Swiss-Prot record:
<dbReference type="GO" id="GO:0004523">
    <property type="term" value="F:RNA-DNA hybrid ribonuclease activity"/>
</dbReference>
<feature type="binding site">
    <location>
        <position position="158"/>
    </location>
    <ligand>
        <name>Mg(2+) 1</name>
    </ligand>
</feature>
<keyword id="KW-0496">Mitochondrion</keyword>
<keyword id="KW-0234">DNA repair</keyword>
<feature type="region of interest" description="I-domain">
    <location>
        <begin position="122"/>
        <end position="253"/>
    </location>
</feature>
<feature type="region of interest" description="N-domain">
    <location>
        <begin position="1"/>
        <end position="104"/>
    </location>
</feature>
<feature type="binding site">
    <location>
        <position position="181"/>
    </location>
    <ligand>
        <name>Mg(2+) 2</name>
    </ligand>
</feature>
<dbReference type="GO" id="GO:0032201">
    <property type="term" value="P:telomere maintenance via semi-conservative replication"/>
</dbReference>
<feature type="binding site">
    <location>
        <position position="70"/>
    </location>
    <ligand>
        <name>DNA</name>
    </ligand>
</feature>
<dbReference type="GO" id="GO:0017108">
    <property type="term" value="F:5'-flap endonuclease activity"/>
</dbReference>
<dbReference type="InterPro" id="IPR036279">
    <property type="entry name" value="5-3_exonuclease_C_sf"/>
</dbReference>
<feature type="binding site">
    <location>
        <position position="160"/>
    </location>
    <ligand>
        <name>Mg(2+) 1</name>
    </ligand>
</feature>
<keyword id="KW-0540">Nuclease</keyword>
<feature type="modified residue" description="N6-acetyllysine">
    <location>
        <position position="80"/>
    </location>
</feature>
<feature type="binding site">
    <location>
        <position position="34"/>
    </location>
    <ligand>
        <name>Mg(2+) 1</name>
    </ligand>
</feature>
<dbReference type="GO" id="GO:0006287">
    <property type="term" value="P:base-excision repair, gap-filling"/>
</dbReference>
<dbReference type="GO" id="GO:0004519">
    <property type="term" value="F:endonuclease activity"/>
</dbReference>
Length: 380
């Protein structure tokens, strides 16, 4: 879910914090991508006649086709992607995960009813609601990435939190995900729609945290409290407080504690056993990989092993996969050129958003497990 309504709120009250770019604008940029979010998009979008792609054994292959071709497209445009996979979800997320299970069970019932009624559009809608990224999907995508020479990392917990840590450390330019809570975790730059389908023709949206805070007149801790009021994955929000009201309250009272003291409890009842303090702490001090322990490396694709996996096991067209590998190899030769703004510091524009910010005190960092294409060095 991320943060409810945050993207629209920023567009309404801090529009200068957003800019839209074509994918070509990111030539030479390293980007940390929320892998689970991307795989979910591929499972939803890469379909044939409304159904996911499958091989003869009935195994789903939509995620592999999506990962293969979208990654090649990024590389062809000079982007150097590193995929970050989710680790163990924080305990605070258990309530949200339980709600998702309930919604899936309800969607399953509605799907059966739609199938019985022969309502094709309803069947497609509820089928997509049942899409879930599994361990097998993740493992197969990791294997594919390693054969493509693309680095990936295993986060100890939430992928978007570790993506944010990589941006703050200057290891990558931006975090790419549809989950807006990447900003709540402190990512200086967030990119949306990077892995969206080309057919949708969505421009890439770039959100700059420093400009958001400046426009709202908030610091990061106050912004975190605003996000909690809007609604997050980690605790309930106060019913009856909409986005604009939440902004007004935070700007006036500066913290959730002070807001609660001044609210009419009959009109705005606070959730029972409200875990807003724990959620606040989680956003400011998440369990993340240690960016200094990570050395990112993009290497030459292993063509024959890719053919063995994608064509032999997953039954994709050999001609198409070999063509994709050629495109990938060619893109590597062109992406070695750097960006001019990596050498010259430009000030006073969105593109000069801070590349590095200090970690909050007590931030829990762990060394991430790394794929074959990503190597470790000792932390500084």
């Amino acid at each position: 879910m991320g943060i409810q309504g945050l993207a629209k709120l920023i567009a309404d009250v801090a529009p200068s914090a957003i800019r839209e770019n074509d994918i070509k604008s990111y030539f030479g940029r390293k980007v940390a991508i929320d892998a689970s979010m991307s795989i979910y998009q591929f499972l939803i979008a890469v379909r044939q006649g409304g159904d996911v792609l499958q091989n003869e054994e009935g195994e789903t292959t939509s995620h592999l086709m999506g990962m293969f071709y979208r990654t090649i497209r990024m590389m062809e445009n000079g982007i150097k992607p590193v995929y970050v996979f989710d680790g163990k979800p924080p305990q605070l997320k258990s309530g949200e995960l339980a709600k998702r299970s309930e919604r899936r069970a309800e969607a399953e019932k509605q799907l059966q009813q739609a199938q019985a009624a022969g309502a094709e559009q309803e069947v497609e809608k509820f089928t997509k609601r049942l899409v879930k990224v599994t361990k097998q999907h993740n493992d197969e995508c990791k294997h594919l990435l390693s054969l493509m020479g693309i680095p990936y990392l295993d986060a100890p917990s939430e992928a978007e939190a570790s993506c944010a840590a990589l941006v703050k450390a200057g290891k990558v330019y931006a975090a790419a995900t549809e989950d807006m809570d990447c900003l709540t975790f402190g990512s200086p730059v967030l990119m949306r729609h990077l892995t969206a389908s080309e057919a949708k023709k969505l421009p890439i949206q770039e959100f700059h945290l420093s400009r958001i805070l400046q426009e709202l007149g908030l610091n990061q801790e106050q912004f975190v409290d605003l996000c909690i009021l809007l609604g997050s994955d980690y605790c309930e929000s106060i019913r009856g407080i909409g986005p604009k009201r939440a902004v007004d309250l935070i700007q006036k009272h500066k913290s959730i504690e002070e807001i609660v003291r001044r609210l009419d409890p009959n009109k705005y009842p606070v959730p029972e056993n409200w875990l807003h303090k724990e959620a606040h702490q989680l956003f400011l001090e998440p369990e993340v990989l240690d960016p200094e322990s990570v050395e990112l490396k993009w290497s030459e694709p292993n063509e024959e092993e890719l053919i063995k996996f994608m064509c032999g096991e997953k039954q994709f067209s050999e001609e198409r996969i070999r063509s994709g590998v050629k495109r990938l190899s060619k893109s590597r030769q062109g992406s070695t050129q750097g960006r001019l703004d990596d050498f010259f510091k430009v000030t006073g524009s969105l593109s000069s958003a801070k590349r590095k910010e200090p970690e909050p005190k007590g931030s829990t960092k762990k060394k991430a497990k790394t794929g074959a294409a990503g190597k470790f060095k000792r932390g500084k």
